[in-house]
Design a protein with these regions (language model features):
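Nucleotide 5′-phosphate-binding alpha/beta core
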Residues: 1-113, 120-135, 139-151, 201, ...
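Residue-level signal for inorganic ion chemistry
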Residues: 39, 114, 153, 207, ...
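AMP-binding/adenylate-forming
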Residues: 129-132, 152-213
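Short, hinge-like loop/turn segments at secondary-structure boundaries
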Residues: 172, 224-227, 274-278
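Short, structured coil segments at secondary-structure junctions
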Residues: 179, 229, 251-255
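Adenylate-forming
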Residues: 187-194, 204-245, 258-264
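AMP-binding/adenylate-forming catalytic core of the ANL superfamily
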Residues: 207, 309-413
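Conserved AMP-binding/adenylate-forming
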Residues: 240-322
Length: 448
């Protein structure tokens, strides 16, 4: 990450706080047109769109472009990126071989991947400058009355691989941020009592993790297994209910930040106690809010431009007279909240597995999956594999799925939990939403 770009962008963000909402929209429009002029000559995908729709890069608006979907990104990756020497196949090989979140592809590009609501793996690239611009909002998030010292950050999540959360947090271990923070990552796939022991020894000032994981830590704090005194807790990766927010704040006796972030756009929104609700970070992002989805345009990523990219998050605007920030205020993000799976481990204790972590499995030909819970000691993993693969590739993918699940269960002391892997041609869809859940709970037998 380019430290100079990070500081320069943060300074620009601070100046933007003094602008009006109209000024920011105009500023973003100029950034957008600059981006379009850049990608017209470097991205075959966008060049075709610009030509087909007769778009003038110097007068265009975002809605001159069609909506982009994750499927578009997956199928047209090689033509979307502006460095035409990069291929999806090369990125896939890199992800398969590299597990350090701070490893750079060709020593130039940050690579992030995730599955998200579609269950399909998407790759997202950032140059060092792109990533620094996207990370600038992370500077100054914590501005509570903390004692002046090197702050200890504990991150609880998936830590082995190129996932957005651990990559964003791990940058605090490098360069300028490491002078301010001492960061330790805690693998969420470990048994909860191991996590608690290590966190007790670390004594974090700041705890960062999924909303569900943070809530479970709060429960362990009440039980006495965990004994920490953070000054700040930061929830990310999942919607945070008002009830859970109050429970976490009361348990840890500290204020809680709710950060809206994604693999595609990094920091997208922030909710602090003094804000009431959440502000979208519109310095370098353009949001289009709809009743059942949101489209976002990234103004800082020149390597993998995303214009009007559709996300399934629902953002509801909140009217406000006296704005603290010159951005759109929305209610807390309403998006996917998956069911956290609880199983009984080999010692007879209940422990959790977050489906969001299984959602980050990297299996080359695994297109989608769904977990059918049977009871607290068994489940079925339904795998939808890519079409057209050979019998050998199919068997290899199924073998890798079994290996990944075995490793996860072993790490959680759940070798006693049994599972079956079924190759499926289709997966169940929630009729009320039209989306397919990662975890299906029908016919459960006393699963928590």
């Amino acid at each position: 990450m380019n430290t100079f770009t990070l500081l320069k962008t943060k300074f620009e963000h601070l100046k933007s706080r003094k602008l009006s909402s109209e000024d920011i929209r105009e500023k973003n429009l100029q950034k957008f047109r600059k981006l379009v002029a850049f990608i017209q000559e470097r991205s075959p995908w966008y060049k075709r769109i610009i030509t087909k729709h007769r778009i003038d890069p110097y007068r265009c608006l975002p809605d001159d472009f069609p909506v982009m979907t994750k499927r578009d990104v997956i199928e047209n990756f090689n033509e979307i990126v502006t460095d035409q020497t990069i291929t999806r196949e090369a990125i896939s090989d890199f992800i398969e071989s590299s597990k350090d979140p701070l490893d750079l592809f060709r020593n130039q590009y940050y690579v992030l991947h995730g599955s998200g609501t579609s269950g399909e793996i998407g790759y997202y690239l950032y140059s060092k400058d792109d990533f620094a611009r996207g990370m600038a909002h992370g500077m100054g998030l914590v501005n509570f009355n903390l004692k002046i010292k090197r702050k200890r950050i504990a991150f609880l999540g998936a830590t082995i691989g190129h996932f957005a959360g651990v990559t964003m947090v791990s940058t605090s271990m490098r360069s300028l941020p490491k002078l301010i923070f001492k960061t330790k990552t805690f693998e969420i796939h470990r048994p909860i009592h191991h996590i608690a022991e290590q966190m007790n020894a670390f004594k974090p000032d700041i705890i960062i993790g999924y909303a569900t994981a943070i809530k479970i830590l709060a429960e362990k704090q009440i039980e006495g297994m965990l004994n920490v005194k953070p000054s700040v807790v930061e929830s990310c990766g999942e919607p945070l209910s008002p009830t859970d927010k109050e429970f976490i704040e009361n348990t840890f006796e500290c204020k809680l930040l709710n950060v809206y972030a994604s693999t595609e756009f990094l920091y997208m929104g922030i909710s602090k106690p003094e804000y009431g609700d959440m502000y979208l970070l519109e310095d370098d992002l353009i949001f289009e809010l709809h009743s059942d989805h949101t489209c976002v345009t990234n103004l800082f990523n020149y390597t993998m431009p995303l214009i009007r990219y559709r996300m399934e998050d629902i953002l509801i605007p909140v009217p406000e007279k006296d704005r603290i920030l010159p951005f759109t205020k929305v209610k807390e993000v309403i998006g996917r909240r998956e069911y956290t799976m609880f199983f009984t481990n080999k010692y007879g204790s209940d422990d959790f597995i977050s489906p969001l972590d299984i959602d980050l499995f990297f299996i080359k030909d695994l297109r989608r999956f769904q977990i059918q819970l049977i009871d607290k000691q068994s489940f079925i993993f339904k795998a939808l594999l890519n079409n057209g693969i050979s019998e050998f590739q199919k068997n290899e993918s199924l073998r890798e799925i079994k290996s990944e699940i075995d490793s996860l269960l072993s790490a959680k002391d759940m070798e006693n939990v049994s599972f079956e892997i079924e190759e499926s041609k289709d997966l169940a869809v929630d009729p009320s939403t039209g989306k397919f859940p990662l975890v299906v709970r029908d016919n459960l037998k006393s699963v928590k």
